[in-house]
Amino acid sequence: MIRTDKLTMRFNGFVAVDKVSFSVGEGELFGFLGPNGAGKTTTIKMLTTLLPPSGGRGWVAGHDIVTESDAVRDRIGIIFQDPSLDERLTATENLFFHAILYGIGRKDAKARIDKALAMVELKGVKDKVVKTFSGGMKRRLEIARGFLHMPSVLFLDEPTLGLDPQTRRVIWEYIRGLKETFGVTLFLTTHYMEEAEHSDRIGIIHKGKLIRVDTPENLKKALGGSAIALRATDDNVKKLANADIDAIREDSSLIVKTEQVDETIKRMVEIGADMMGISVRQPTLEDVFIDMTGSAIGEESGDAMGVMRAAVRMRRMR
């Protein structure tokens, strides 16, 4: 359903997306995992014909994204990262305007709107003005709008960004429902590890380069071993470094990857490391990302523009 061949985007000499090649099968939920600035949104903009690529090629639903852009647009739906509803209109009016843009007749539009609103459990508020909606309700309405014209492929750019964990889980129920009920192909960008876990396959993107594509389980299995977590105190950092025990800082913890858990813990005790609160776990997607890129995903997301956009988004979601 989606295929790219060395897809590239440059902005004034800066390479935002660097010769990215991958494919997404029909009915697949494909997750694009990476921090802000990794090239996720730029890739979506190229695939949805909003931005012409600087190089390479891409196909969506069998159509070239450059030479057959109209055919691509007819077959896709988009849920943008930033809110794009007209908050002065009602839920029904927002969807009806979308139906007009896609040439859906009035009678057919009414039936589709009723079905879409029922799908995301908003039929009871269909005549309420959107500015009265919570952030989660607005996101559900955007999902309904994105699927109103029954696209073959639905692109979701950070669909739960700015939402609380409980609301994120609810939104994910609707996303999975689209795949299971309608068999739609889903291309989703995220920097939330728990969301990437729901994907059939994940593409890890870092600084514009596609590092790896595989299932979540295969990515974790390939890393191998176990992870020992202990408190990231200055004393622990110094003692592990002096003993040549490699550790990566992750939030308030030091993570030591090892194939020999018992031997490594014994060595930590011998060097006098603080073992209070120590835990042992199997590799996570966070560990995979760190191993492949050298940094935690949160450490890559602090550019000023991204922070400003996040603040604006949070205000709109309230």
Question: Where does each model-flagged region fall?
Answer:
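Conserved ABC transporter NBD signature motif
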Residues: 56-64, 72
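Conserved ABC ATPase "signature" region
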Residues: 96, 100, 107-125
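Conserved ABC ATPase signature
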Residues: 129-133
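Conserved catalytic motifs of ABC-family nucleotide-binding domains
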Residues: 150
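Catalytic Walker B motif of ABC-type/P-loop ATPase nucleotide-binding domains
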Residues: 154-157
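ABC transporter nucleotide-binding domain
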Residues: 173-259, 279
